[in-house]
C-alpha cells in the first residue's frame, strides 16, 4: 500500500497484466505510457515490453481503435489510449463493430479490448472543440459496450484490471482533471466490479449521485451540508453501463430526495438516466439535476468557470430540495 497518482495506479495495473499475458498489447499516440511516483520504480511500458507490444502509432484515432479491435478478435488482449483531441473519432467503429460483433457471432467471438478515452473535464482555456465532457453519454448509449468512469486512483487501478480481463469491449473514460489525484492504492493486483456504484458517504436526508470529475465537487458539497446538519448519501456511479440501479433505488427509497450532478451537458446527461431509473422504482421521491449548460465551453476561463457546475450549486439546490 502506498500513495499513488491516478496515472501510476493505472499503468501499474496494465504492467502486471502485460507481464502475465505475453500477447497483450498497448496502442497509443503522443502520450507515452510512462509514470513515476515517489518511493516507487518508474513504469515505462515501451521500455519494458518493446515496440512490438507497446505501439506508438501515427495520429489516427480511428486506426488505433481498429487495430485494438482487430487484435481482440484475433485473440489478444489490447488496450488503446486515445487522447482528448480524438475521443470522438473512433465512435463509429466502437458503435458499429465493437458493440455488435460478439452478439452477431452468437457470443463466440470474444472482445477483450479496452478503449481509454481521455476527457479534458472541460478544461478552462481549451475552447469548444477540445473541452467537451459529453462523451460519457455518447459511449454509454452503445449496446454491447461497457462504459466505466472511475473517480479515484484506487478504483482506476481495480477497474482497469477488471476491464482488461473482461471478454466484452470496455470504454474506460479517463477524466483528465483527476490525472494527478493521489491516494492510498494497494500494491497487489485486485479487481473492482464494472457494474457496482460506490456509496462514498451515508445519510438519510438526500441522495446525491455523480461520477468521474464530478465526484470531488459532490464530496466537497456533502462536507459543507454535513456541517449544516444535513445527512447526505453521496453515490459514485463508477459504471455508466451497466448502471447499478439497485444501489440507486435503495438509497432514494430511504432519503426520498435525489440530486444528480454532471459535468456533461444537461440534455441526456447521465443524471437524466439516473432519475429515470429511480422514478420507475420509487414512488413519491423528489428529483433535481445539475449539469453543464447546453452550450459549447468558451475559451475564456472566466466565462467557463461561470458556466461550470460546482459544489456551491449543489449546496444551494440541496437546501431547497430538502427545505
Across the structure, where does each feature detected by a protein language model lie?
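Thiamine diphosphate
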Residues: 1-169, 173, 178, 305-306, ...
